Amino acid sequence: MACHFARWVAAEPEPDTHRLPPNVLLSARSLSEKQRKRFLSGRVLLAEMMFYLYGITELPAIITLPSGRPSFESQNLPDFSLAYAGTTVGVMLSSEGKVGLDLEVIHARSALINSQQQAQLSAVEQTWIALQSDPVESALQLWCIRQSMLKLSGLTEHGEKSLSLNPASGRLRSAITPEAQVMSDIDGSLTWACAHSPAIARLLCWRYSPESGFTRTQTLSIQQQPHSPHFMKFTSLPPAK
């Protein structure tokens, strides 16, 4: 099953909102200027993806699930995940299964992730980080991977202990989502992680701009992986007995 991951550096003062319904524009009015731009940019990118991939001209109705996770109201529409890092907006979409996306700006973290976040890492994860040539970068990439899985599972607030990663073997175990796969890479100062349940057959990566629309940058799969030294792939271990 194919997943789509699109990024947009939203440098425009105001995004073009012609594909957004009136209720979305109304909801944005109560937000601060920074929050409003992020909110609208994320939904503009989602709306443009829905038009580009499925021919849907206006963003469908979105609800908030009890977990706090946004979702299309219609269960017949794709699952999606939104992420923001600096001026970059990201959307991940899949017509099958569930998705989770996270983006992090590397230069925004001048030190290792804080002590509270480090406490959520297993000894295996901390040992792997310490052995890397750039522990700051490696710690942030692992954190990004964790966040994508937690967003997939709807557990961004209190689900840290439900997930363990083994970076050396590329395996993960989630108590909430027993079948999942994650792909992650570092692109310049940005690290990204795309999680999908049950598995990523193909990940189609796109860049978006209002002027040129969508441009496919790469297609990733089990057989077709980038030469990037930072690319990581995690696959679920069987549930612990």
Q: Model-predicted segments: where are they?
A:
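Conserved nucleotide-ligand handling architecture
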Residues: 1-241
